[in-house]
Amino acid sequence: MNEERLQWRTNPAIIAQYFTGEDLPKDIDIHLKPNEACVVIEDGKITGIATAQRLTVNPKLGTLSRILSKREPFRSFLFVHTGPHEVLVKLDGRWSDGTEGKGAAGLKIRFNNDDLGRLLSFAADGKTSITLGDIASSMELEISQKFRSAHMGTTHPSSAKEDRDTATLLESGLRSISQTALTDIGAQLDRVWLSWIPSDHERVMGMRSELEVLAEHGRLIAARDNEMM
């Protein structure tokens, strides 16, 4: 494998990719875009976060170290596209009048370089390719439950859909709830939007499914390319 053929991000659905040192050739040069970073882990501990446009990863053990019989550390690498990204979250619950409400929320987020290590929780659970769908799934339940309890149950549907002041209050509430959930994965929230059009709720799920299919397609292509190198 050479630097020109190594593409850690195979499609827009993937926002982070985890590799062990065994997955990569020794002393490989990798180019990072301005909004990409690489978390370097040695023997289970983060030793650095690289943001340079070009870096060499997975270095060979030096001659002196080999002579002294030093053990090569177990290395792994987490590449991250820091954003911005738009995460789609479905919302559902009951309004103050008892009617059912379904909507969609869009969260424009970006990842903080200093907190990228928090994404390693996905790798610990066996997810080596982290997608926007994974990010949404990790916090959707928390956001939906808290928003339903704190805001939907005390709001009339007509006000949510037609009154600008009410809509602003709901967006503010969503922002507060979402930022708490995003902190757990090392991200910050730039802006939010809300829609109570029923079709948008279904569109969120459809778009997410399409992105996951693209992500899986990209993983298969990457695996095939790696086998050929």
Could you tell me what each predicted segment is?
Residues 62, 171, 205-206, 216:
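Short amphipathic alpha-helical patches
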